[in-house]
Amino acid sequence: VLRALEPISATSDPAKLSKIYGSRFAKAWELLKEKRVKKYVFNPSGRVMWIVVGKEREYLIYPAVGYCQCDDFFFAVMDGKALACQHLIAQRLAEELSDYDVVEAEDRLFDSLMEDQRRLMLPPREV
């Protein structure tokens, strides 16, 4: 997945990226333009968490390993049917273009945000 994201840089031609990633690039571009890519910076540790706000929920992105929590990543990217999901593409574009919102928070909030993300990954429980 990381190798699949290599073509994305600040000087990349959008038409070329559209050919490489297809409709996922267009969706990623919309996420970028709608300011849905968030870089959380926790202080004083300096830890960073990337979140892309999707239509249904927020997705935790691990850019260093090329991972996203979304279903498209799990079903299409992991099966080799797609190079990357729209959220990973959007995060990479945002970082390369320095076009993202920075959210600064205290370190004590990191664990609760991670717990929220973990809860979102669990299947719904029956009542």
What are these regions (language model features)?
Residues V1-V127:
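Long, low-complexity, compositionally biased intrinsically disordered regions
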